[in-house]
């Protein structure tokens, strides 16, 4: 069915969930950890493991708990209907605080116009509540509560989520070894507590993006002293894509581990698309409001006004957008600094504001109206993601005067946001060679006083179109280790075209690898549990456990099947690369058995003799490739 024919039918009648996104992972189950009140139920994924084969000791292996961003979609006990949206997680928490009110209807002019247009009925999400807003004079941001000494339900929720049943894992022996990390000055505790979360938010070192109108949200935290997070981008464009396809991209992305999702739609029906996305999203949704504002003036940047932009902010805040990218650091005086660059201004939002500044020869209205923007943000608890509109678009332009000038301005704006108790993170590059990455991180920590850093990569070289998920994954792992709090994924299609589902998955898995590698290097508590469990499964030839413990079980299983497709290969005591005679792990096990039988320490074994004897034994037993387990 074409996009056009889909839109001819009411989406509220026809929309369906992407079936691939709602399949539970093999040997995994959704578990919920109870908080201090019955409605704090924190979801995690528990991976059940096989018993160690008798040849290797026959021990029971405890299940491994992993962070889960997939929301109710992978819970077989939940009925998913994208036409109705996800269940309500947060309304009771918000009601109990008593500082918000229901509005009689939408406040934004544009929202009212869309609601009154009968032509949009077929596209409109059918179950929309009137929005909330802070009561007059109130501030409903998580930072405001934190600075008042209040531990909110959201703070407790993320503390439980970050720990991932760490105490149980330690008791089960899943963390017998974890290398000490080097955190470059971060203050990572041995256990994440609700009070620690509150302190980090009050300090501005972390944010919980959680708009009061996004009640379907499962809260998460972004900060250098927590697990490194990743963001995935979706959104339609003038080239096409339906609302249903964008919801499918959302559910597919969070299945594979996207901690937040940015809707970067620039095509038709941006307002309606966003409503469907938010109502079906368990993760924070971010936007770049200037994109929609530009659509409202038919793409003519010079026609943008503060009044129109303000209306756009209110429109999106009342829908439930959790964080806004605001390019308020693109100042008139910085624009000429980009003239000698190889790639000029590559940020879409940055180029829009630069064009407006030059056309009017006035200062950026996002900068001059920043206090007014803060007033809107704290009325809905929308977090800032201060955009790097002058980020380098090539390694030749990295760390130049324009980039760092804007960064200093973003530091200034961060302090203004904090005066309003508005949560804030900072966006970063971009394209940066490896030797310059740490300077970026250090400069951001200095200028922005440790506000969370959120970077696009960075890409470490410009010579690999089609492989920029790899060029950027290298930089992402490095900057994550140095202190970056969230990494924006890059797909293989970067610079080339619009990503499809496979590209989205590839980008997310690449960035999950980078984020996890950074967590290991920083020494985040419990980060090595999954590595240890998978390594043990690999050594014991528990093939299914190896697949299921991996970030992408489907691909791992398919690769193994290409070489050894039969079920019997899943219990083989050798790997698919080396075969039975050259498998180092099989040989090591046999050397250990020899040492145990001889009652001597394995390190004292005559390795050559051991290998020779075991090779002879293998031949005498008929060179059997498989053993019953």
UniProtKB/Swiss-Prot annotation:
Give the binding site residues for substrate. Answer: 233, 262, 291, 327, 347-349, 388-391, 427, 454
Enzyme class per UniProt:
lyase
* GO annotation, cellular component aspect: cytosol
User: What ranges does the record give for the region Disordered, renumbered to this chain?
Assistant: 1-22
Q: Where does [4Fe-4S] cluster bind?
A: 575, 578, 583
Q: Which cofactor does it need?
A: [4Fe-4S] cluster
Q: Which family does it belong to?
A: Belongs to the ThiC family.
Q: What is this protein called?
A: Phosphomethylpyrimidine synthase
Higher taxonomy: Bacteria, Pseudomonadati, Pseudomonadota, Gammaproteobacteria, Pseudomonadales
Gene designation per UniProt: thiC
């Amino acid at each position: 069915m074409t996009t056009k024919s889909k839109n001819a039918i009411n989406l509220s009648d026809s929309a369906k969930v992407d079936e691939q996104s709602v399949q539970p992972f093999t040997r995994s189950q959704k578990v919920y950890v109870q908080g201090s009140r019955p409605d704090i139920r924190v979801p995690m994924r528990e991976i059940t493991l096989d018993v160690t084969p008798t040849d290797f000791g026959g021990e029971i292996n405890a299940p491994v708990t992993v962070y889960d961003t997939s929301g109710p979609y992978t819970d077989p006990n939940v009925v998913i209907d994208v036409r109705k949206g996800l269940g309500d997680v947060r309304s009771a928490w918000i009601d109990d605080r008593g500082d918000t009110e229901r509005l009689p209807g939408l406040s934004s002019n544009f929202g009212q116009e869309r609601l009154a247009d009968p032509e949009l009925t077929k596209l409109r999400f059918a179950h929309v509540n009137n929005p909330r807003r802070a009561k007059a004079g109130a501030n409903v941001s998580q930072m405001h509560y934190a600075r008042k000494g209040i531990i909110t339900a959201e703070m407790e929720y993320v503390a439980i989520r970050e720990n991932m049943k760490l105490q149980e894992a330690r008791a089960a022996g899943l963390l017998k070894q974890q290398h000490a990390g080097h955190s470059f000055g971060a203050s990572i505790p041995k256990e994440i507590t609700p009070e620690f979360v509150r302190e980090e938010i009050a300090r501005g070192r972390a944010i919980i993006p959680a708009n009061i109108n996004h009640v379907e949200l499962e809260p998460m935290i972004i900060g250098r002293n927590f697990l490194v997070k990743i963001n995935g981008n979706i959104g339609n464009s003038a080239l096409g894509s339906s609302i249903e396809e964008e919801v499918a991209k959302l559910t597919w992305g969070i299945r594979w581990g996207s901690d937040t999702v940015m809707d970067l739609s620039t095509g038709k029906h941006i307002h309606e698309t966003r409503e469907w996305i938010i109502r079906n999203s368990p993760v924070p949704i971010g936007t770049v409001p200037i994109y929609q504002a530009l659509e409202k003036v038919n793409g003519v940047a010079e026609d943008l006004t503060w009044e129109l932009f303000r209306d756009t902010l209110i429109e999106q805040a009342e829908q439930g957008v959790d964080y806004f990218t605001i390019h308020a650091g693109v100042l008139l005086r910085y624009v000429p600094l980009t003239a000698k660059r190889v790639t000029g201004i590559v940020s879409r939002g940055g180029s829009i504001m630069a064009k407006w500044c030059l056309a009017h020869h006035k200062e950026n209205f996002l900068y001059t109206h920043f206090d007014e923007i803060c007033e809107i943000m704290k009325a809905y608890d929308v977090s800032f993601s201060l955009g790097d509109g002058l980020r380098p678009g090539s390694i030749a332009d990295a760390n130049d005067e324009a980039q760092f000038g804007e960064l200093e301005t973003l530091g200034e704006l961060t302090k203004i946001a904090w005066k309003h108790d508005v949560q804030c993170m900072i966006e970063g590059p971009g394209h940066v060679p490896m030797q310059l990455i740490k300077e970026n991180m250090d400069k951001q920590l200095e200028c922005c006083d440790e506000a969370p850093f959120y970077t696009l990569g960075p890409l470490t070289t410009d010579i690999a179109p089609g492989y920029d998920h790899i060029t950027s994954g290298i930089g992402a792992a490095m900057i994550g280790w140095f202190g970056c709090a969230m990494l924006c994924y890059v797909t293989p299609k970067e610079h080339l075209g619009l990503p499809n589902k496979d590209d989205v998955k590839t980008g997310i898995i690449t960035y999950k690898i980078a984020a996890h590698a950074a967590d290991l290097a920083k020494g985040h508590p419990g980060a090595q549990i999954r590595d240890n469990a998978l390594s043990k499964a690999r050594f014991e030839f528990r093939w299914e456990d190896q697949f299921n413990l991996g970030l992408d079980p489907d691909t791992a299983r398919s690769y193994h099947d290409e070489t050894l497709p039969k079920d019997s290969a899943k219990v083989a005591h050798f790997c698919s690369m080396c075969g039975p005679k050259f498998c180092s792990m099989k040989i090591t096990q046999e050397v250990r058995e020899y040492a145990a039988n001889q009652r001597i320490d394995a390190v004292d074994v005559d390795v050559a003799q051991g290998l020779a004897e075991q090779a002879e034994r293998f031949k005498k037993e008929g060179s059997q490739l498989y053993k019953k387990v």
